[in-house]
Design a protein with these regions (language model features):
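Terminal intrinsically disordered/low-complexity segments used for targeting and assembly
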Residues: 2-14, 19-73, 154, 238-285, ...
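Periplasmic alpha-helical coiled-coil/stalk elements that build and connect Gram-negative outer-membrane
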Residues: 3, 23, 146, 162-279, ...
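Small/polar, glycine/serine/threonine/aspartate-rich low-complexity segments that form flexible
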Residues: 43-46, 50-59, 108-135, 258-276, ...
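Transmembrane beta-barrel architecture of outer-membrane proteins
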Residues: 64-66, 128-130, 177, 222, ...
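A glycine-/polar-enriched beta->alpha junction
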Residues: 70-79, 89-101, 133-152, 162-169, ...
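A short glycine-centered flexible hinge/capping loop motif at secondary-structure junctions
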Residues: 210-214, 419-423, 460-464
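Short terminal targeting/anchoring segments
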Residues: 216-218, 423-445
């Protein structure tokens, strides 16, 4: 009897296996987006790419390294994104389990006394026992509905991991830029202190000249105003440093540790002085937001397959095999075997357009994801192109500001000597001090802008997922 039972099961399994190759998922074609094949202002000749460059290979400051490490461990946005990815991974495992039949074992035992009036005048005690294995309501995936849903769940998980990576890149770049602002405020404080000290020295000399009648009280008041201006600039830099540290504390989700390594000056923040874009726009595929958009498109593609499969019959199998007896000792004796096989089929006939509407909606959602993918690529291309052209202009502007700062510093030094010897006037000295300080401040601000641009370009090119270039896993691990 058991042999006769297994034959139809094996035949059904063979047919199901033969039909399981059928799938309704449309063939995936990556959308072609109209962007330039190469980036303007990218003249780098080496083959290094940002995505293959670890953030410790890019940023040079050990203090910044430590802050990034803490942020990747404790930042709430990244932890939320990572937990979302884990939840979707488990959801994918649940969906994948639907591809296979669920096998359950069961055992039952009962002992019952029947009243005498119901048992022909004499009370009777009856027993029954059974054990078995069964498959309950397993739907054969003949037209790929389960596999389409499984593929959609997998792409949803991949999308969540890409979203996590995007948050990762944002944190690395945000911590770097906040740290650069803190370094900038620190150096602006030192510059204001040096200028304040120089102006106080000049003021003391001017006081002597005023007593000697060489300069007027007006000249003295002008120098006092410059001293007050330098003091105000110093206090502004102190405020900016505190605010930058507050921003860093939010990013790392804790107060700044007291044992951080000493920081490097703004001029020594990078190990790589010039980051090439990679010559072609294909480098955009390294960006997590592009990967996330593509996985969303593939998920929508798989949903079309599930909607198509809903038009076809669904076959559900329920079956069991086991043994039963009215005596426990005879439960596994020959002849006490049992089996049951109950297939069912559901054929959609009249759905009043619901299935057609469901398929049309799936196709529309797929087209929406195509548009979203194209928009993501266009936005990514613009991010890189803007960062590259900004880098080109910022480098030229920075070089010009450096020359300007040096020229004004030389001029100030000469006028200070001339002022001491009574050749230059107090007005000449005031103008030279203002010009030199303004040039130094502009050069410092230019340094900050260049550093922020380098951090933005690194992120725009998909860099920052790895700690070191030879890492195979995420930098957060």
């Amino acid at each position: 009897m058991k042999q006769n039972f297994f034959k139809p099961l094996l035949s059904a399994a063979a047919v199901a296996a033969a039909l399981s190759g059928c799938t309704m998922i449309p063939k995936y074609e990556q959308p072609q987006v109209a962007v330039s094949e190469t980036f303007k202002y990218d003249n780098a000749q080496n083959s290094i790419q940002a995505a293959s460059l670890g953030w410790q290979d890019y940023f040079a400051d050990p203090r910044l390294h430590r802050l990034i490490e803490i942020a990747l461990e404790r930042n709430t946005d990244l932890r939320t994104a990572a937990l979302n990815a884990e939840a979707l991974r488990e959801q994918y495992r649940i969906t994948r389990a639907n591809l296979f039949p669920t096998l359950a074992a069961n055992g039952n035992g009962a002992r019952q006394r029947t009243a005498a009036d119901l048992a022909g005048g004499r009370a009777a005690i009856t027993e029954s026992y059974s054990v078995g294995l069964g498959v309950s309501a397993y739907e054969l995936d003949l037209f790929g509905k389960a596999r389409s849903n499984n593929r959609a769940a997998l792409e949803s998980y991949f999308n969540s991991t890409a979203a996590r990576d995007a948050v990762h890149l944002t944190i690395v770049a945000s911590v770097a830029k906040a740290y650069f602002n803190e370094r900038y405020a620190e150096e602006a404080m030192k510059l204001a202190q040096n200028v304040l000290k120089t102006r106080e020295q000049t003021y003391r000399l001017s006081q002597l000249k005023h007593k000697a009648g060489v300069i007027s009280a007006v000249d003295l008041r002008q120098q006092e105003a410059l001293i007050a201006s330098a003091q105000a600039d110093y206090e502004t830099a102190v405020k900016n440093r505190v605010q930058a540290r507050n921003a860093l504390s939010v990013l790392i989700n804790q107060p700044l540790p007291d044992d951080l390594p000493a920081g490097l000056p703004l001029s020594r923040q990078f190990k790589v002085s010039r980051l090439p874009a990679g010559l072609t726009s294909d480098v955009l595929l390294n960006r997590p937001d592009i990967r996330a958009a593509e996985h969303s498109l593939k998920q929508a593609n798989a949903n079309i397959g599930a909607a198509r499969a809903a038009f076809f019959p669904s076959i559900t199998l329920t079956g069991s095999v086991g043994s039963a007896s009215n005596e426990l000792n005879n439960l596994f004796k020959s002849g006490n075997g049992t089996w049951a096989f109950a297939p069912s089929i559901n054929v959609p006939i009249f759905t009043w357009g619901a299935l057609k509407a469901s398929l049309d909606a799936a196709k529309i959602r797929q087209q929406i994801q195509v548009v979203n993918y194209e928009a993501a690529v266009q936005s990514a291309f613009r991010d890189v192109a803007d960062a590259l052209v900004a880098r080109e202009q910022l480098e030229k502007a920075h070089a010009a500001k450096a020359k300007q700062s040096k020229a004004y510093a030389d001029q100030l030094r000469l006028i200070q000597l001339r002022y001491k010897h009574g050749v230059s006037s107090a007005l000449d000295l005031l103008d030279a001090e203002r010009s030199s300080y303004a040039a130094d401040s502009a050069l410092l601000a230019s340094s900050l802008t260049r550093l922020e641009n380098m951090a933005d370009l690194y992120k725009a090119l998909g860099g920052g997922l790895k700690r070191f270039g030879n890492d195979t896993g995420d930098a957060a691990k």
